[in-house]
Amino acid sequence: MESLSELQNPLLPRSPTHLHGPYPYPEASPAWPCREKIYSYLLGGAGPAHAHQLLDPGSLQLAVEAWYRPSCLLGRDKVKEPRPGSCETSFTEGREPPAGPTERSTEPGQAEEDVAIQTVSYGVQEEFQGQEGDPEEEESDATSTESESEDNFLTLPPRDHLGLTIFSMLCCFWPLGIAAFYFSQGTSKAISKGDFRLANTTSRRALFLATLSIAVGAGLYVAVVVALAAYMSQNGHS
């Protein structure tokens, strides 16, 4: 069975005798030509050419390669390693928030405003219609009352004024009374036939002649009384 160190470090060789130091990487061979130059560069060796030399960005990689072989270097993938000074920009499709709740929340207020506007417009229209309809309603009411009165007047049978005509014929000026009595009889005949227009006409004529007969008879009676009084006064003086 394998040991615990082999299970923890499966990539390391089984004989670590050739390893040096705490790092599990093999050392470079002493015959490597760039090692002395890297030592002098990193340790600040004296040299007139090195006094004013600028820092090379690739010196760190060379220093690491000087200590360890390039084939045994283990590190992270440069492609996948995030850089501290870099920033990633990702483009995502912006989904607009559903406008359903807001629209639903605003729909009741708009419905109330519409309802209020509609009620106001209806009220104004009703007022205008009422103002415009008042004269028309009055005219229609007047015409309807007139038509109803005419209908009632036509439906009601006219009176024949029989008693008045008899009184005018016997007690007053009898020629006019006889004419009034004649129209009174014509009114009765028209009513029996159902001709209300003719009955109405004859009734008016009978009433007019009876009234005229009474007036004329009253005048005659007054004149006769005055004449008798004058005549008797003359006889008394003589």
UniProtKB/Swiss-Prot annotation:
Q: Which residues cross the membrane?
A: 163-183, 206-226
Where is the protein situated, by its record's location annotation? Membrane; Golgi apparatus, cis-Golgi network
Q: Which InterPro entries match?
A: CD225/Dispanin_fam
> What does the UniProt keyword field contain?
Golgi apparatus, Membrane, Transmembrane, Transmembrane helix
| UniProt topological domain (Cytoplasmic) ranges | 184-205
Question: Compositional bias of type Acidic residues: which residue ranges?
Answer: 133-151
**How does this chain sit within the bilayer?**
Multi-pass membrane protein
Q: What is its main location?
A: membrane
**Claim: Chloroplast is one of the keywords in the record:** no
Q: Name one GO cellular component term.
A: intracellular membrane-bounded organelle
* Tree of life domain: Eukaryota
- Extracellular compartment segments: 1-162, 227-238
Where are the stretches annotated Disordered? 1-24, 78-111, 126-155
Q: Does the keyword Cell wall biogenesis/degradation apply?
A: no
- Family assignment from sequence similarity: Belongs to the CD225/Dispanin family.
PANTHER family xref list? SYNAPSE DIFFERENTIATION-INDUCING GENE PROTEIN 1-LIKE (PTHR14768:SF4), UPF0338 PROTEIN (PTHR14768)
Q: What name does UniProt use for this protein?
A: Synapse differentiation-inducing gene protein 1-like
Coding gene? SYNDIG1L
